[in-house]
Structure formats: structure tokens, C-alpha cells
UniProtKB/Swiss-Prot annotation:
This is Fatty-acid and retinol-binding protein 1. It is found in: Secreted. GO terms for molecular function: fatty acid binding; retinal binding; retinol binding. Binds retinol and different fatty acids. The gene is far-1. The lineage of its organism: Eukaryota, Metazoa, Ecdysozoa, Nematoda, Chromadorea.
Amino acid sequence: MYHRLILLALIGTTMANVIPFSMSTIPEEYKEFIPEEVRNFYKDLTVEDKEILRELASKHATFANEDAALEALKAKSDNLYKNAVELRNFVKAKIDSLKPDAKTFVDEIIAKARSLRSDDGHKLDTEKIKQAARDIIAKYQALSEETKEELKVTFPAIAKIIGNEKLKRNASTFLQKN
């Protein structure tokens, strides 16, 4: 159970960097687990900013890479681009500070999260999300204790999630096969 929670936290953190979403869709009791920098980014979005993010998210398959997506964002809004780059740099700095095993693990989570996005902008496939989480859990369990501890220290929101009994129950229910 402990491992599932850590992984869901990491997935959540990386998904925030990968898939634009609205903070208003997150239940209040879970918002405290979103890193402050991510909350601030979404809190400061204007209606126009949200529309730009939705538009670009629906076209994500047309971008060769993250830099191409950021260039498209810059063409739409310099201010939104600046804020997105600031958030990206924050997350990138955390990832870059990790030792090789932890960094590789987080990079794999990001790649897995990106692979879950629908090319046509439709809803994410819940079964694919569950399978991705199971795959990541298996990889996490194979990590050394030192690497697991480094992940907890680098991503402190995880520590809050680990101790939350309601989230533990929800994670267990969500990851059941059917």
C-alpha cells in the first residue's frame, strides 16, 4: 500500500507537468497534496490562459517535443509562456538534482504519463492508467531504500500523501483490476 501511494504521488506530480488541467476539478481535500508551485501556476491563470492551454493540449500530438509545445504557447501568450517555463524549470531542477537511479525512475514516470494522453483529446483510458500505475509500482519496489528515501525528500508532497489514510484507501480501490 505504501508503495502505491508514493507512486500515485509521483504520477500526480508529473502529470501536473505533462497534462494541463483545471485546479477546480480537484476535490478540496486533495488540493493540499499538489505542490505549491503547481497550485500557484494554475491559480494565476486567466480565462484566456485556460483556453490557450486547452487548445494546445488538444493538439499535443502535433508537437515534436516539449520545446515545440512551449514555442506554440509563446506564440499565443508571452506571459503564459514565461510562467510555464518557470514551472517547467522548477520541476526540471528537482529532477536534475536526483542521483542517477532516482532520476531514471522519475524520467520513466514522465514518459509513462505522457504516453497515457489521448491523441484525439478524448478522456484518458482508466485501464491504461491503472496498468501504468501497476508497472511503475513494480519498478519502484525494485529501487533501493536509499533511492526511495531520496524521492521522498526531493518531492515532499509525497510524505504528506503517505500518511493520509483516505488516500491510501482510494489508491487501493483504484488500482484493483476491475
